[in-house]
């Protein structure tokens, strides 16, 4: 463990902590709105930064680079296709959520269906968070940090003991941010760490390409695009970890769950100052997601060129970072990875606290709980679920098929059934609560049966697409046989300004064509004749960008409108 590495790691970590404390020292975290929703005050850049850093963590940095090391660029679909579902969030989901002024997704489910449906979803999310998602985040973070700093060797302890130690330290740091500071503290820390992640994340492939080119960046690019160039192909084949058919069927559903219904993510946009700010934040995130392959996938391809004999593919990213970055930068990037882990961990920890206190506790245990009591209970539950995650994390030592794919398969047990009942609840106002309960049960049972018990030779994303179709049919049939007595309607709670961003649809079109351009451009390396499609797509995206810049400049002096909770706006 090098002293310069430690100094740069501690220095950047302390800088983030001090700035976060300074920014939130006068923020109200004792109230329900202040702690759980940051007082509904977040603007688009902060929302996008917070969404990105909550999403980008070591399970992706390690897991996706590992998949790219084995299979190539086609795994970028996990990230790039998120642009489609972030457009869904901006145009379909967020307007409905903010109109009702909800604090959690189960709030909507209770209003749309009934209390029992809400409680079922609360328990599903809390169980998945505590025993599946957060342990994987902690374990992958500990694995990466141990590889970077050789903690086990430095302290003369075993690899397993080093993982336990790092998991505990990461868990404690996450508790401090989430349980003590609430969502505002996380959003501020995310913004700072986001800058570091962009800088550090881009430095890894840059120095990696220089290493590939034996000191020349351009020769590194030439080697990447000429030697094993087929690894750059964006179109996944039937035997790849992400076949192209699965990317635009089951994966769209998985990403819709993640970006549009997952409490840990959506809570960032529920805290937006207005619908327009939330939409801008969601679409800005969509743009950033299309740049993710540079940070998450390209390092795996570079590692393939440099180290073709790694014992485990998930070692590709930390090995590359440790070998190509200058010594002080390893410490800095270790601090950035630390911040990314903490952001994801405390983001979902805060959401779990919200769901338990405002859902289960207030509805089952103490229906007369005061707002301050809900905050206290939420903090205590956050501490509890953090301890559970810390205890489970080190046991994920030998995840089959790599960390990333394994995590996605486990989450598939409940995520697509949840997406189904929310979408059907939006567009079919007569579907009753019974349909939601039956669909959740059938969706979970059918997925477990097809994917785990009966060994069909199907990619799990195709299985999810099938379960979605089954759930839709089940809900439509029940809705036809036993419809709601009265159709459900969305009523405005006047929680935030509901005026949409006027350019949201134009920006969405530009993002879609940019995504098509990314796929088409890289498909050339697989022998597909997609050059003209890529050029046309890039041109349309560029026109949209120019229009948005011009429109923003033209209206730069327009007076701001102040929103008031009574539904009347004023200048």
Curated annotation (Swiss-Prot):
Subcellular location: Cell inner membrane
Cytoplasmic side: 1-3, 96-118, 184-191, 262-283, 346-380, 437, 482-505, 554-571
Keywords annotated in UniProt: Cell inner membrane, Cell membrane, Ion transport, Membrane, Sodium, Sodium transport, Symport, Transmembrane, Transmembrane helix, Transport
GO MF, one example: D-glucose:sodium symporter activity
Key word Membrane present: yes
Protein family according to the UniProt entry: Belongs to the sodium:solute symporter (SSF) (TC 2.A.21) family.
Transmembrane segments annotated in the record for this chain: 4-24, 75-95, 119-139, 163-183, 192-212, 241-261, 284-304, 325-345, 381-401, 416-436, 438-458, 461-481, 506-526, 533-553
Main location: membrane
GO cellular component: plasma membrane
Topology of the protein relative to the lipid bilayer: Multi-pass membrane protein
UniProt name for this protein: Uncharacterized symporter YidK
Topology Periplasmic: residue spans: 25-74, 140-162, 213-240, 305-324, 402-415, 459-460, 527-532
One Pfam family from the record: SSF
């Amino acid at each position: 463990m090098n002293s310069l590495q430690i100094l740069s790691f501690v220095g950047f970590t302390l800088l983030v902590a001090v700035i976060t404390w300074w920014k939130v020292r006068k923020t109200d975290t004792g109230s329900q709105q202040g702690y759980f929703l940051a007082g509904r005050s977040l603007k688009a850049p902060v929302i996008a930064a917070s969404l990105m850093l909550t999403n980008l963590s070591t399970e992706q940095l390690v897991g996706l680079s590992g998949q790219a090391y084995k299979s190539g660029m086609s795994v970028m679909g996990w990230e790039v296709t998120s642009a489609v579902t972030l457009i869904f969030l901006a145009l379909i989901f967020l307007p409905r959520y903010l109109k009702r002024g909800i604090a959690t997704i189960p709030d909507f489910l209770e209003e749309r269906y009934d209390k029992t449906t809400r409680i079922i979803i609360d328990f599903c999310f809390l169980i998945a968070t505590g025993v599946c998602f957060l342990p994987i985040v902690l374990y992958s973070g500990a694995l990466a940090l141990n590889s970077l700093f050789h903690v086990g060797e430095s302290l003369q302890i075993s690899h397993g003991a080093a993982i336990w130690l790092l998991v505990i330290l990461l868990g404690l740091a996450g508790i401090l941010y989430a349980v003590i500071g609430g969502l505002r503290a996380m959003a501020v820390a995310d913004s700072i760490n986001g800058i570091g992640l962009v800088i550090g994340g881009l430095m890894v492939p840059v120095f990696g390409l220089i290493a590939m080119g034996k000191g020349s960046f351009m020769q590194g690019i030439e080697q990447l695009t000429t030697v094993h160039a087929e690894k750059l192909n964006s179109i996944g084949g039937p035997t790849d970890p992400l076949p192209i058919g699965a990317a635009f069927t089951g994966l769209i559903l998985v990403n819709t769950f993640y970006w549009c219904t997952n409490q840990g993510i959506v809570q960032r946009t529920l805290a937006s100052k207005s619908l327009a700010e939330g939409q801008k934040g969601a679409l800005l995130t969509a743009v950033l997601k299309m740049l993710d392959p540079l940070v998450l996938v390209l390092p795996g391809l570079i590692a393939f060129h440099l180290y073709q004999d790694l014992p485990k593919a998930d070692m590709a990213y930390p090995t590359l970072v440790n070998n190509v970055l200058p010594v002080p930068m390893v410490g800095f990037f270790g601090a950035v990875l630390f911040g990314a882990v903490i952001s994801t961990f405390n983001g979902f920890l805060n959401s779990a606290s919200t769901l338990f206190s405002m859902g289960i506790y207030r509805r089952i245990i103490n229906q007369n709980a005061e707002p301050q009591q809900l905050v206290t209970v939420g903090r205590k539950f956050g501490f509890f679920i953090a301890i559970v995650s810390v205890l489970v994390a080190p046991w994920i030592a030998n995840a089959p098929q790599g960390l990333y794919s394994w995590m996605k398969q486990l989450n598939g047990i409940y995520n697509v059934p949840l997406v189904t009942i929310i979408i059907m609840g939006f567009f079919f106002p007569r579907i009753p609560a019974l349909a939601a309960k039956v669909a959740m049960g059938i969706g979970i049972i059918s997925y477990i049966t097809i994917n785990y018990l009966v060994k069909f030779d199907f990619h799990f994303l195709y299985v999810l697409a099938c379960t979605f179709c089954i759930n839709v049919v089940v809900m439509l049939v029940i809705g036809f046989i036993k419809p709601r007595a009265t159709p459900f309607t969305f009523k405005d709670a006047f929680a935030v300004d509901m005026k949409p961003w006027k350019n949201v649809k134009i920006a969405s079109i530009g993002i879609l064509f940019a995504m098509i351009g990314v796929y088409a451009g890289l498909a050339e390396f697989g022998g597909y004749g997609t050059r003209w499609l890529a050029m046309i797509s890039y041109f349309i995206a560029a026109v949209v960008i120019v229009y948005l810049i011009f429109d923003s400049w033209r209206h730069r002096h327009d007076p701001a409108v102040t929103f008031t909770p009574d539904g009347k706006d004023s200048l």
